[in-house]
A protein has these predicted regions:
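Conserved beta-strand hairpin/beta-sheet module of binuclear metal-dependent hydrolase folds
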Residues: 1-49, 142-144
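Short Pro/Gly-enriched beta-strand edge/turn motifs at strand-loop
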Residues: 1-3, 100-103, 124-128
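Short Gly/Pro-enriched turn/cap motifs at secondary-structure boundaries
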Residues: 7-8, 104, 110-112, 131-134
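Divalent metal-coordination and catalytic microenvironments
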Residues: 19, 30, 60, 72, ...
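Short, glycine/acidic-enriched loop or turn micro-motifs at the edges of active sites
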Residues: 24, 33, 63, 86, ...
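Structural motif
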Residues: 25-27, 52-55, 126
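Active-site HxH/HxHxD metal-binding segment of metal-dependent hydrolases
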Residues: 34-39, 43-122
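Core dinuclear metal-dependent hydrolase active-site scaffold
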Residues: 120-144
C-alpha cells in the first residue's frame, strides 16, 4: 500500500509529496520547500516514519518545484531527477527564482539526473512509469 503525504510549500503554494510503501522506501516529488520550516517539516516526517528516501523526482523544471533540492541532497545524497527536455530550466533555477519571485538563491543546487519516457522510478515494491505531458514546460511529466 502507498502512503502519500502532501506538504504545501513556498510563496506559490506548490505541493511537495513524500510517497512511501510498507518497505519504508520513499520518493520525494516536487520538493519546493523554500523556508527552513518547510524543509524541516519534510525531514521530520521522514525521520518520524523512519523512511528511507531513494529518489528525488520533479514533474518539471520550474523553481517552485525545486527550491528544496539542495536540502534533500545534503540530507540524503539524492540528486533531482527531471525529464531531459527541462535541462535548460534546471540550469537556470537561480534566474527563475529572481525573475519569478524576486528571490536570490544563496545556495548551490545539486546537478540533476535527466531521464526520458523510458525511465522507471523504482522504490520498495512499487514503480512509477514516466508519462510525458509537455505543455506547462517542455519536460513536464506525470508519474504513474
Amino acid at each position: 500500500m502507498l502512503t502519500i503525504k502532501r506538504f504545501t510549500c513556498n510563496m506559490l503554494q506548490e505541493n511537495c509529496y513524500v510517497i512511501s510503501d510498507d518497505t519504508k522506501e520513499c520518493v520525494i516529488c516536487d520538493c519546493g520547500a523554500y523556508s527552513q520550516h518547510e524543509r524541516q517539516s519534510i525531514i521530520d516526517y521522514i525521520k518520524e516514519l523512519q523512511l528511507k528516501p531513494v529518489h528525488l523526482i520533479a514533474t518539471h523544471g520550474h523553481i517552485d518545484h525545486n527550491f528544496g533540492n539542495n536540502t534533500i541532497y545534503e540530507q540524503y545524497g539524492l540528486r533531482p531527477e527531471v525529464h531531459k527536455e527541462d535541462e535548460h530550466l534546471m540550469e537556470m533555477l537561480d534566474k527563475q527564482a529572481e525573475g519569478l519571485v524576486n528571490v536570490t538563491l544563496d545556495y548551490q543546487m545539486p546537478n540533476p539526473v535527466y531521464f526520458d519516457e523510458n525511465h522507471v522510478i523504482r522504490f520498495g515494491t512499487h514503480e512509477f512509469t514516466i508519462i510525458e505531458t509537455p505543455g506547462h514546460s517542455p519536460g513536464s511529466v506525470f508519474f504513474y
